[in-house]
Amino acid sequence: MRTEWVAKRRGQGNVTQMHYARQGVITEEMQYVAQRENLPADLIREEVARGRMIIPANINHTNLEPMAIGIASKCKVNANIGASPNSSNLQEEVDKLNLAVKYGADTVMDLSTGGGNLDEIRTAIINASPVPIGTVPVYQALESVHGTIENLTPEDFLHIIEKHAQQGVDYQTIHAGILIEHLPLVRSRITGIVSRGGGILARWMLHHHKQNPLYTHFRDIIEIFKRYDVSFSLGDSLRPGCTHDASDDAQLAELKTLGQLTRKAWEHDVQVMVEGPGHVPMDQIEFNVKKQMEECSEAPFYVLGPLVTDIAPGYDHITSAIGAAMAGWYGTAMLCYVTPKEHLGLPNAEDVRNGLIAYKIAAHAADIARHRPGARDRDDELSKARYNFDWNRQFELSLDPERAKEYHDETLPADIYKTAEFCSMCGPKFCPMQTKVDADALTELEKFLAKEKEVMI
């Protein structure tokens, strides 16, 4: 799709969407996004130029269908997939990708740490994906030194980061915000450091007594990203891993650094979004979103959850969707889904489905609350179909049509019930939606009430 679009850009020193936007150019990607979002193309360009919106679109991911992440666009959902040393393989991950796209994932992150050749898995996912692909290069950097964190060098990190960029990765989580001086701040936490990438870098700094190499070499990463139009997803290494640890000094110290790094990337026209927590009580979610906007100059916020309670293993797609809906309402640009397997194991296909649907609900609810143009149109259409007992239309408009039909057909499977004016909940005699009040009846009632009012006066 994008082959012709990017052909003329190849060989230029800076090919980022932000670079073109700041030159006043509306790229084909911006035009495409404008149509998808039903927004003016020049507004898209302005938002990208300001850094309030990103269009993650590596020039080597030519089958990508461009999309936007930002406060002016619809709230987006990311799905995580990825093989581990103990579970899954290349084909399973491609299948998960296809399932995630089917159920509405706006972006997909490949978090593979094993299960085969990581380069082959990543390439297969990118080649099959119409949505932006994100990665965490620290994982493969660690694999390249056979799991011995102390042996990692800055060059190891940069080599893997460039490899991912060359392969067509659209955004990379870069854990550059965790600094050596932040580490003592985790003493009072219950769960310490829960970011895998953050944990790797923390151990490296503790061993070498040196500053985070991703921080000291941030300019080198910028130069790589400029050449391929890779977006930063600045990782929150010190995100809280439980509600007790939310909004603490460690989290906020890193957030301040992430804001500084955001502005440094913007100096070179490189796109940025900022990752956020995590586990956050409901009363702290608004603070967290507004604090990020303040510290990071309104760069798009991308949050994991957040989970609003810690006591529901097996149901964390629910505990987190509650927080995600609130975060989206307050202005978060993208929600990273959580599956029922969170904290318990690697998600399978059904877990991916359940997590995604929970988060599509959260994002859609946020769009309605934020009064996005047309956000409620689908709800209204489904409500009309429900009132008219148009069962097939209800299924069609559902976020998960297969599940809706499956539940309906558990008790009333015959085709005749697809036109019935009841379901198995109320049966044929007690459904309140059978009470159809026509306009003539209401007019007569209004006349009667008016006369009654005159008599009372």
UniProtKB/Swiss-Prot annotation:
InterPro entries from the UniProt entry: ThiC, ThiC/Bza_core_dom, ThiC/BzaA/B
Enzyme class: lyase
Residues engaged in binding substrate: 80, 109, 139, 175, 195-197, 236-239, 275, 302
Catalytic activity: 5-amino-1-(5-phospho-beta-D-ribosyl)imidazole + S-adenosyl-L-methionine = 4-amino-2-methyl-5-(phosphooxymethyl)pyrimidine + CO + 5'-deoxyadenosine + formate + L-methionine + 3 H(+)
Record keywords: 4Fe-4S, Iron, Iron-sulfur, Lyase, Metal-binding, S-adenosyl-L-methionine, Thiamine biosynthesis, Zinc
UniProt binding sites for [4Fe-4S] cluster: 423, 426, 431
Co-factor requirement: [4Fe-4S] cluster
Pathway field: Cofactor biosynthesis; thiamine diphosphate biosynthesis
Binding-site residues, Zn(2+): 279, 343
Gene3D superfamilies documented for this protein: 6.10.250.620, Radical SAM ThiC family, central domain (3.20.20.540)
EC number(s) per entry: 4.1.99.17
Annotated NCBIfam families: PRK09284.1, PRK13352.1, thiC
Protein name per UniProt: Phosphomethylpyrimidine synthase
Organism of origin: Trichormus variabilis (strain ATCC 29413 / PCC 7937) (Anabaena variabilis)
Lineage: Bacteria, Bacillati, Cyanobacteriota, Cyanophyceae, Nostocales
Originating gene: thiC
